[in-house]
Amino acid sequence: MKLFNKELATALLVAGALFMEILDATVITTALPVIAADFNVPAAHLSIGVSAYLVAVTLFIPLSGYAADKFGARTIFIAAIAVFTFASVLCGLSTSLFEFTLSRILQGLGGAMMVPVGRLVVLRDLPKEKLVKTVAIITWPALSAPLLGPVLGGYIATHFSWQWIFYMNIPLGIIAILASLYLLRNTKGDVGKFDIKGFLLTGVGFALFMAGIEFLASTSDKLLQSLGVIAVGLTLMILAIRHVKKAKNPLFSFDAMQHKTFRLSVYGGSVVRVALGSAPFLVPLMLQLGLGYSPVEAGSLLLWLFAGNLAIKPATTWIMNTFGFKRVLVVNGVLIALGFVALAMINHTTSSFTIAAILFANGVTRSMHLTLINTIAFADVPPNKMRDANTLGAILMQMNRGLGITLSALAIAAAALILGQSPDAPNLQTFTLSMMFMGAVALVSIYDSLMLSKEDGDSVLNKRKAKKARQS
């Protein structure tokens, strides 16, 4: 029996890097009032620190695949971790909003290179039969970090000082760099001339789109400006797609879209990610503003969603191998929609135990679906297309993350309008309608799953092993 599995260790390393990146996008949200007081600015102004990070990540992700092939995957991965860690130190040392924002932009640059390159290292040469287990490992940060971030940030800001939110990245970064030197090969790929036009169109287009939806979610008095930024971003993205299809050496291509299983992760996968991404935003607000729970009580209940994420993990591979992708995606998609209905039915008489059970069940279906979508995305993608598929997937996941929060904010505003209430003072009825709306969004994603055949994605499954396990 092998005591050390290098493939497993590499997957855990990349999962840790992904956890750091996503955690830093969410961990400061509950600490914003404390940081704002130190900078002597209104707390609302600190939202630029959140937006700057997310926009910077989106801006530089298209560059990640090219940089990894040009300079070596290990070189870029280690450099990205170093930049991310150094920027974390600068964030902690910041004494003004301007310094803090610049540090967050630099941190976003590191995060943009760190996560996609890390995933590429794991996925490019991975045998298909190991894809299911590996993706399950590197998916858990996307499940846990958005839930743990606000709770951890609030705890650190309350019991220590907000600077430690960033300083805790220092030992993690050092460990990740040392592990990378031992575990990773500095593989390079064939690259042509750098596609600067493609980078500007894709990077700026995606970044403006993300900035627009961030503004849309956080401001109610600048609707036209936000929509204008989104429109410019979408225009640049359309021009980028046209450019990529015609360019001889594009920064990345859309060839992976030829595979039905990858298209599922792009279309239906994006829809369900947006719906699932709304839960960490809507649930705490509903518990506090709708039901009168304290921030600590709401955060504690939200951890049951995280518990559900973890509880199903040991069974996800067996479920996929036993029932196949199509059946599980369709059934689980319906369960996700029903989960939002259950959240919508919560009222003042609902016990904390029942709320915890509903959140736990939602965590189970959330974990199952994201693992399915992230696995089937690469099931039929050959190694020579993995870089482009990985880059496109990373961009979409970043955009889905922002869209989930924006759509949640818009759902609250629309529900308040329907009920004749103020969007600035939502009550339980507002959240009931919002949850029902997000359930409908989740249900729409099932359409793409129904278009799959029973055999789609079978190349990465081990059905014979699952059948043997059932018979024993």
Model-derived regions: residue spans:
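Hydrophobic transmembrane-helix bundles of small-molecule transporters
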Residues: 158-268, 434, 438-439
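A residue-level signal for alpha-helical anchor/packing sites in multi-pass solute transporters
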Residues: 121, 125, 155, 211, ...
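Helix-breaking motifs and short loop linkers at transmembrane-helix boundaries and internal kinks
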Residues: 38-40, 72, 93-99, 160-161, ...
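Intrinsic disorder in cytosolic terminal tails and internal cytosolic loops
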Residues: 1-6, 450-472
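Structural signature of transmembrane alpha-helices in multi-pass secondary transporters
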Residues: 21, 50-53, 57, 84, ...
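Helix-loop-helix hairpins in multi-pass membrane proteins, especially solute transporters
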Residues: 61-197
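Small-residue-rich packing faces within the transmembrane alpha-helices of Major Facilitator Superfamily
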Residues: 58, 85-86, 109, 170-177, ...
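12-transmembrane solute porter fold
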Residues: 7-23, 28-30, 43-50, 65, ...
